């Protein structure tokens, strides 16, 4: 159990190191307004904190830096919520204020904005389309041979594709098909659409559409859409600006891992609900042993739909990043409910 004095010194060391990236010595601490102890007392308390494993000495300086154990204690026990600047809150809310909420577009823009606001790498795992439910479908003729099929899901996902309209299918048939599809398929999970169409809808269409076989073939192509989650990155190269990553081998290893989207799928796909903070070697990848990953899930009710994460150095602005992620996930969840 740390004393009040040790807690204050530990928090001050970590706050100072996060801001400066420079090891913190007793002289630096003695100049802080909140530290009213003598230099000798500060040195003794720092020695005790080092012995307990919360801070450690670097080879190049007489100062101390936080250890992984120190960061973990800081995040779990010393972190205070940070109020975000009003301009940033407005910028984020404006992103989600669009009349038509497209989850994929918002996910992509969220990754970009988060990377700019933090100067870290932002990763957003979009909703898995297979669990989305069909809201409606439109088929808009462009000319006699082509049309655009627009599929909208309950989470705001909009999938459009150009399809070929067989000569034997006239425009009145298209209109009948769309009406039947919306009546029978609205609310059906995307992953069940194919079976639903070919086991139930075909029999209904047979009674209304003249050139039935051609129409069914066109429908089959219309609903062939990718169902897996999409992953979006913002600021992939931002880690290069962090002083911890001036080692070429370390940077190469990290950037190679960031480029491996499959690995991030595995890291983000099974996150628990809420905010999670993984520090250093708590991360599963050795390339991330000098990094922290803060992630937050967004959902509708009890259904978890995706994950937003920030990858940065262990010397991360934890309070600010957590506040940003909380705001983003609230806005994302509210947008999906529209």
UniProtKB/Swiss-Prot annotation:
Coiled-coil annotated spans: none
GO molecular function, one term: DNA binding
Protein name: Heat-inducible transcription repressor HrcA
Keyword set includes Transcription regulation: yes
Role: Negative regulator of class I heat shock genes (grpE-dnaK-dnaJ and groELS operons). Prevents heat-shock induction of these operons.
Organism of provenance: Bacillus cereus (strain ATCC 14579 / DSM 31 / CCUG 7414 / JCM 2152 / NBRC 15305 / NCIMB 9373 / NCTC 2599 / NRRL B-3711)
Family: Belongs to the HrcA family.
Keywords, alphabetical: Repressor, Stress response, Transcription, Transcription regulation
GO BP terms, alphabetized: negative regulation of DNA-templated transcription
């Amino acid at each position: 159990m740390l004393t009040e004095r040790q807690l204050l010194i530990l928090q001050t060391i970590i706050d100072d190191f996060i801001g400066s990236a420079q090891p913190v010595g007793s002289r630096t601490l003695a100049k802080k307004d909140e530290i009213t102890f003598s230099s000798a007392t500060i040195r003794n308390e720092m020695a005790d904190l080092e012995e307990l494993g919360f801070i450690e000495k670097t080879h190049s300086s007489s100062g101390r830096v936080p250890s992984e154990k120190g960061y973990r204690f800081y995040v779990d026990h010393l972190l205070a919520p940070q109020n975000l600047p009003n301009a940033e809150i407005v910028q984020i809310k404006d992103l989600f204020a669009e009349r038509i909420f497209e989850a994929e577009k918002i996910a992509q823009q969220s990754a970009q904005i988060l990377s700019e606001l933090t100067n870290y790498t932002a990763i957003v795992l979009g909703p898995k389309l297979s669990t989305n439910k069909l809201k409606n479908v439109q088929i808009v003729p462009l000319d006699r041979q082509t049309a655009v099929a627009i599929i909208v899901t309950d989470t705001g996902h909009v999938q459009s594709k150009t399809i070929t309209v067989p000569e034997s299918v006239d425009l009145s048939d298209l209109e009948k098909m769309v009406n039947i599809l919306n009546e029978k398929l609205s609310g059906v999970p995307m992953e069940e659409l194919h079976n639903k169409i070919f086991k139930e809808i075909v029999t209904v269409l047979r009674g209304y559409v003249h050139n039935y076989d051609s129409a069914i073939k066109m429908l089959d192509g219309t609903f062939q859409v990718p169902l897996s989650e999409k992953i979006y990155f913002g600021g992939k190269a931002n880690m290069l600006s962090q002083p911890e990553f001036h080692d070429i081998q370390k940077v190469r290893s990290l950037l190679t891992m960031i480029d491996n989207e499959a690995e991030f799928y595995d890291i983000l796909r099974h996150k628990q609900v809420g905010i999670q903070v993984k520090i250093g070697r708590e991360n599963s990848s050795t390339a991330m042993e000098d990094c922290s990953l803060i992630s937050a899930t967004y959902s509708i009710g009890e259904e978890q739909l995706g994950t937003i994460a920030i990858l940065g150095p262990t010397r991360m602005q934890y309070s600010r990043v957590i506040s940003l992620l909380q705001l983003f996930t609230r806005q994302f969840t509210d947008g999906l409910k529209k």
